[in-house]
């Protein structure tokens, strides 16, 4: 074989290999479509306590085509829609071939009342803002979907932490509106025990700071930063994970120093309303109304919803066919924050969605 023919043969092999490689790789990167922003405004919104507010705005982002089955995604406290687009959550769920592939589903992620670009106390009313709760937030979501977007049915509702609690409320308040429910990092039982005590202390530590001044401050009260970090360390992060990353005195001090030095963009009044809105949460009375499949996902190291209480097992007896996935604790999990990392339950979520009744 001549040198020329050898080179030609090598070139053909390279071309064939390249062709096969291109055929095996999608033409588009494995990323979901870019989010589209929108807002719905209620000319007049009445809250659970009779208070009203004109022009309540609920901001949202969507992924995918409106003609596809709709999925409602609900974020946690102190978050906004953007948190659900993170690489650990949305990056594991909304891309091509993933459980909630945005080329097959219409993903809707609202900012809850009081956060993000939705109407909130810091827009101007401060401490005179209506006292909203989770029921109000769910009502606003329902009206946004039905009145603002013309959506009368959902394929799935999936929510994390506060969003998980609101998913439970959705199931009992609007039974059958969604084909399936996936409440995560939550329990349907009333807000109580350490979960509420820590939230109450979080709110009180700011309200009792003279710098808060009944909500009429000109600079953020110093207590806001301290209260936020205390709450996060106490109710999030995971015992094994903290032992791995802060297992020495020096490492623990370094982590505290970093958190205290980090920029804080929160507003104290918004913060108080966000955490206080959970005070009267209790989805238990609506459990018997839930007739659709439920996949509840919690973690074994969840500081706010410890599985050893048996509360979830007892509650799920009220929901025929409900499944409970408890993610085992490890140095890789993050306590209450574990469910923000979808890699821990992608397989189970995929199976659950595939098993939903056909429509």
Outline where the language-model segments fall:
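Active-site nucleophile elbow and catalytic-triad environment of alpha/beta-hydrolase enzymes
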Residues: 270-286
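Short beta-strand/loop motif that positions the catalytic acidic residue
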Residues: 290, 296-298
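Conserved alpha/beta-hydrolase "acid-adjacent" motif
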Residues: 303-310
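Alpha/beta-hydrolase-fold enzymes
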Residues: 177-261
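Catalytic active-site module of serine/aspartate enzymes centered on a nucleophile-bearing elbow/loop
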Residues: 322-359
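Conserved acidic catalytic loop of the alpha/beta-hydrolase fold
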Residues: 135-155
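N-terminal cap/lid subdomain of alpha/beta-hydrolase-fold enzymes
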Residues: 61-123, 311
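Conserved hydrolase catalytic core segment
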Residues: 153-192
